Amino acid sequence: MTVQSNNKLASQVCEACHVDAPKVSDEELKELIGLIPDWVPQVRDNVMMLEREYKFKNYKLAWAFANKVSELAESEFHHPSILLEWGKVTVTWWTHSIGGLHKNDFICAAKTDQLGD
């Protein structure tokens, strides 16, 4: 992954998303996932999501990272699932209102990657 590719998404701002907002197409998914290759598309309960696991040396560092993700979520008004475990944080982004992936999810995934830098 190039930092420039990730920055292309991370420099963008989430837009307000409503129930009738379009989900990303298969073509858009291929393009956008190429910009954040450490993220894995997952389908749960027929809902496409983006997921990534981050590893840390201990619980305290994982907790600090989870807090940073929470602050990002509030600033973007877009909220992921965050699973905090000893030495590990799993972040899952999807757009609840449309039941799938929107460009906002990719923007937030890219911004999440930058939190560890």
UniProtKB/Swiss-Prot annotation:
Per the UniProt entry, what are the Gene Ontology biological process annotations, in alphabetical order?
A: tetrahydrobiopterin biosynthetic process
Q: What is its EC number?
A: 4.2.1.96
Q: Which residues form a coiled coil?
A: none
UniProt entry keywords in alphabetical sequence: Lyase
Main EC class of this protein? lyase
Recorded catalytic activity of this chain's protein = (4aS,6R)-4a-hydroxy-L-erythro-5,6,7,8-tetrahydrobiopterin = (6R)-L-erythro-6,7-dihydrobiopterin + H2O
Q: Which CDD domains match?
A: PCD_DCoH_subfamily_a
Q: Is Lyase set as a keyword in this record? A: yes
- Asked whether the UniProt record includes Lyase among its keywords, one would answer yes
Q: Which InterPro entries match?
A: PCD_sf, Pterin-4-alpha-carb_dehyd, Pterin_deHydtase
NCBIfam families hit by this protein: PRK00823.1-1
Protein family: Belongs to the pterin-4-alpha-carbinolamine dehydratase family.
Q: What name does UniProt use for this protein?
A: Putative pterin-4-alpha-carbinolamine dehydratase
Q: Which organism is it from?
A: Colwellia psychrerythraea (strain 34H / ATCC BAA-681) (Vibrio psychroerythus)
